[in-house]
């Protein structure tokens, strides 16, 4: 649905697609997203799509991942925009995490 919806805009139109996708980087969902011309910011900057687990059940870096592994939070982009930085933010305040997922961050320039 996202691929079809985004295709209605001119090719250079800047679009961002972000969030907790609850699916791994190598899934069929992302194969479909890529086929629509979307690129993933962390992969573009760091040369790798898999950057470790981003969900942590409010336990942060101490979370035991079990059988689930891999990043499920992404910042996708298309159009005349380019990421210049991307990171996984693992900050806590007084030992408490504001979310059960680490935050994804990306800085872009509009071309």
PLM features: residue spans?
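Catalytic-adjacent loop/helix segments of enzymes that bind and process anionic phosphate/sulfate esters
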Residues: 1
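Metal-dependent phosphoester-hydrolase catalytic domains
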Residues: 4-16, 21-111
